[in-house]
Amino acid sequence: DILLLHLIGVNVILVHGGGPDINAMLDALKIESHFENGLRVTDKDTMDVVQMVLAGKVNKGLVAYLSALGGKAIGLCGIDGNMIQVHTKNEKLGLVGEIDHIDTDVIDSALSAGFIPVISSVGIDSHGQPHNINADTAATKIAAALNAECLVFMSNIDGVMKDPKDKDSLLHKLTVV
């Protein structure tokens, strides 16, 4: 579907996370991980793994997949060109970023050159420190910065939950306010 949209002239941008791959790598490296309110507490070692997995393995895997299908994709990270600018969300969470600004220059350049930008959800603060960002939040902020006509979420979870710990709290209808 991504390639079809691209072929008919729709500017498609793919923003991704990679929680399961991050978990697998943290486990393999024997780095303990825990969550607070659905957000991964991210110390420096964890951030190194997050960046390695998202900007490396997952991002390049998606680019390779799209390329194998005949697409023209380019792998980007929110750090590139200071694209996703953040500040630390909460000291308790460590290097988890709250998005302050999206600089669309790199995205616009990639789109103008005919590429499908594939963007990993890692941001950067004013001191050059990478931060972990929720991919859904990054996608939403990027779509808003680009005045996108449409935003589509694909996920490995059932949908939006009123209580993330309660699978019966799935919201079947959302209203934009």
Mark where each language-model region is.
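Nucleotide/pyrophosphate-binding catalytic subdomain
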Residues: 1-177
